[in-house]
Structure formats: structure tokens, C-alpha cells
Amino acid sequence: ISGSTTNNNTTNNNNCNNMNKNSFNTDNSTHNTININNYGYENKDYITKDYLVKLLKEPFQAIPKLIEYTHFNKEHPENQNIKLPNKKQPYVKILKGDKWVYMDRKSTILDLIDEKHCELNDIPLLKHVEDNFSDNLQDRFERFNDRYLNDEKDFTNQLYKETELVMI
């Protein structure tokens, strides 16, 4: 709490008016310190099996959505460790060794897509898909994996573009 006193003296036709004004200001600021994790060391505790299963029901959107949920989630700013500083430049910035470093945009995004594909193909998760998804959902997931693993150019380009849009 800080206080201040102001004395104003005004003379008007030999009349003296004294005014005392007291005001008190209270600073109720909250300072939050957020420690951002290095790229590759994200907190994934909040990414539940149920959330991943939900993503797998729409596998063709799963990777960009998982990237957004991991790296651009407002509720988890500690994972906001990759930036696209200028959409016209071929670089991204990642937090590495507690410093922001420039990396090649295309290779970094493709690595990120690969990482999320691996997360979605975790053995226990695949077992859940096999045991609980309808044949139609299983087929859709298998088509997604086949296209990804066969490195189909159109499919890979679409994933890249959707991931880039998440970053903008």
C-alpha cells in the first residue's frame, strides 16, 4: 500500500482555501512465472488415452490436432516451445538448451509430424483401437497409416500444410 498527500493552496480575493486530499493505491498484481520446457521435453501428463482415442476416430485430422493440443494449448503454456516467427521465412524457432534457436522449418515440421504419428501408434493405443473401434473406424485408421507409411506425396503435403496453419 502506498499513500500520498497533496496540499493545494489557492488564493482568491484574499480568501485562502486549503484542501487536503488523501489517496491510497493498492497493487494487487499477480505475477506468474512460466518455465517453458525445451523442445522435445514437453509435459504430456494432460494428454489422456481418452483424448488420443477421440483423435483416432478422425485419423486424418489427428496429427495437426495433437500438435496444437501439445504445443499451442493456452492451458499449458509450458509446452509453447516452438514458434513460427515469420511465415515468409523458412525457419522456426525452438527452445533448446533454454535458448531460442532457429531451425529449418520444413525438416522441423516433418519431424514433429513423425513424432505425433508415433504417439498415435503406441502399442496399447493400437490394441484399444483393435478391440473397441468398429470395422469402419479401424479401416479408416489403417488407410491413414498406410498413406502415412507409404509417404504419399499429396497426403504428406496436406499434413504439412495443416500443421503449418496450426503454427500461424
For each predicted feature, which ranges?
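Extended amphipathic coiled-coil helices
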Residues: 2-168
